[in-house]
Amino acid sequence: MANPKVFFDILIGKMKAGRVVMELFADVTPRTANNFRALCTGENGIGKAGKALHYKGSAFHRIIPGFMCQGGDFTRGNGTGGESIYGSKFEDENFKLKHTGPGILSMANSGPNTNGSQFFICTEKTSWLDGKHVVFGKVVDGYNVVKAMEDVGSDMGNPSERVVIEDCGELKNPSS
């Protein structure tokens, strides 16, 4: 079976920046990939925090040029929240896949076995994160949108413009 593909339609400020399409490596990290996929579709409804388990409307709160774009905190919006479809946090599935370069999709965490909903998209090779963060996908289309997001980032991570996931979901025909 083909790996699932999901999308983000990104707003930068008030401008529609375009669509980012990501392949999720369900063949290597099925639990992590399924969490991200379900948070893209919103199919699991409301979480324990009382918020929709859905990336739609959430922001990329931390963008550091030459490093990564981080998002997925749909409960607090500032990097201190988030929730997985399995409850609050879940374990590191494995570290088989590496942070090999731009477009790699990986889980943000606050230490071992603290995966929730926060994730980041690498804009460079970040091998120092190997063995600490679970890689579970990659950008397969729309990397130009990620570069546009990176352009509004800062060394401290605070974007100069709000970067929002205006819409998201799963592409039903992953082979296309």
From Swiss-Prot:
Keywords: Chaperone, Cytoplasm, Isomerase, Rotamase. GO terms for molecular function: cyclosporin A binding; peptidyl-prolyl cis-trans isomerase activity. It is found in: Cytoplasm. GO terms for cellular component: cytosol; Golgi apparatus; mitochondrion. Its main location: cytoplasm. SUPFAM superfamilies: Cyclophilin-like. Residues 7-170 form the PPIase cyclophilin-type domain. Belongs to the cyclophilin-type PPIase family. This is Peptidyl-prolyl cis-trans isomerase CYP19-3. It comes from Arabidopsis thaliana. The gene is CYP19-3.
